[in-house]
Amino acid sequence: MQQESDDLLQKVRDFIKALENRSNSNDFTKFYHPEVVQTEYPNTLTKNTTTRMLKDLEAAATRGKQVLQKERYDIVNSYVAGNTVIVEAIYTGVLAIPVGKLKPGDEMKAWFAQIYEFKNGKIFRQRNYDCFENFF
């Protein structure tokens, strides 16, 4: 059981590294189950709860590459319970375009809680609770 927990946590760590280093959506979409559903709850950037399927996640990644020069996720805490991994992370994104009062090259910071549920070794459900610093 411990090995399975370690494997799931490592998959999430690898997924996050792929997000940080992405050059194309295949770098991270390989971690997703074909029937993935990602839910992002309201925050500074997303005013309403947003649900994304795989094709939506690919499109969001393309948009993200236009907004960010680079991004980093520093994992503060992580927990595994059954087929679920919970991660608390500090997010830093370096902007490529102006967002609110931030200019290109400025850092956008947030505190994330992310919940990943796995099915057949892939991320099947993902829930994001993102708390951004006020940049408007």
What residue ranges belong to the model's regions?
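Short, charge-rich amphipathic segments
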Residues: 1-2, 13, 41-54, 95-96, ...
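A solvent-exposed, acidic/Ser-Thr-rich amphipathic alpha-helical stretch
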Residues: 5, 25-82
